[in-house]
Amino acid sequence: MPKRGKVLHKEDRKNSVGRLLFVIVAVIIQIIWFWFFLYYLTESYLWASIFAKVLAAVMVLGVFSKRSNASIKMTWIFIIMAFPILGVLLYLLVYGSGFTKTMRKRIEAVDAMLFPYLDQSHLILDQLKKENKVVGNQFSYLENTGKFPVYRNTEVVFYKEASIGLDAQLEALSEAKKFIFMEYHAIEDRQSFGEIKAILRKKVEEGVEVRLFYDDVGSIGFIDPKFVQEMEEWGIQCRIFNPIVPMVNLFMNNRDHRKITVVDGQVGFTGGYNLADEYFNIHSPYGYWKDTGIRLRGEAVGTLTLLFLEMWHAMDDSPVRGLYNYLPRHWERYNGQGYCLPYAYAPTDDMPLAEDVYLNMIQSATESVYITTPYLIITDEMSRALCLAAKRGVDVRIVLPGIPDKAFVFAISRSYYPQLLRAGVRIYEYTPGFMHSKQLLVDHVLAAVGTINMDYRSLYHHFENGVLLYESPCIFDIADDFYELFRTATEVSPDKGHNRSLFTRMKQGALRLIAPLL
């Protein structure tokens, strides 16, 4: 297992944690104030009490009729019925955010300008369907729902370690001639990003356009508040996704979890790792950090370019200009085999595209389904799909962390073990440390690699991206990585699914009830 530098003990983050704590405390105080105010009204005035009960009943009906996942609806109905005042208040805060609607309109407007630049001829998709109708339908869903085209002229390389991927990124960045786009959930201004930053600064001096886009919450414990100012002084354009403010606005719950690097529109990177030291085992608070990534070279990079521009322009409603400067009009011939389709999900979408991709893949499996994920907090639909696959004889295996980064979330993940184990799903825990890669491999020919965890946050609440691959040579490398994990990890005994005590059942039931909100 390669190391990038000296392993350090976990240190206190001094940078912007104070701002995050201030915002959290301010929001909690506001919610408590609203709750006490409404509680006072309902206790002091009969009309207010009646109105609150009627509103709660109406809200329950509204939640029930909402086009959403059943588990999420059930959790909200329980909260509203058990705690009418607080439940109604929280629900309105989460789903009544005007900014969410504004963001949806911005993304739709930007997409209307961007996506016509992608090849929507369906010729490659038609060819794929002739070769394999079932797999072709997987790609067809993404073309029909998200307008994401499938490509052939793309070379794909899989990196089984984040540190190897970072080295490849550094090399690609150093060769940039026109532009560099980077979008990440978390950036830490220390050793690993320091290497990137030095190259970016040099490239700006050479006349290369550099844009950096990152999520505020994901990076808040990693970078200094003056980070943006420093980047812009160097000539690096920098934008922050959904900056947190000390005001009640539950769109803060929707974060940008995408991870994209694009160089000159010809080379693109994505995968599970952010640009922070712990992802490259420079800093190891949770044992060995296991993460993966991929590099695309060729036509499929066009989709990654547009995904970056989508978020860049949607965040501040800026005009879209000069797209042909970023999308090559003529492509070189690459040694790309198989089919490649980059895609993305946004919580403003009408369809749960991220979950649907995984469900479609699992339901089409005839031999094997291999999954890596840091979290296992799944819907009833996903749980049923995994169980049904195992019961029809498919070899279903899931690899999770051996050392979790969040003990409470890990306890919820383990609450799903009994049902899956009883159905024949094999579960592994990565003994050396924290499993952070997000991969799904079906029948050794179809794979998805990207940023999407098997939890509600990725499947419903976050902005995510991934790449769907079919018969790409790199799938052999992905399969080898899985088999190495199976040898390294510890398999959970099937007995874990039997003989649970009443207390354990009650605890797991309570955890599962709140799981959709996490």
Mark where each language-model region is.
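Glycine- and other small-residue-rich loops at beta-strand/loop junctions that grip anionic moieties
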Residues: 185, 374-375, 409
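Helical hairpin unit composed of two closely spaced alpha helices linked by a short loop
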Residues: 375-396, 401, 406
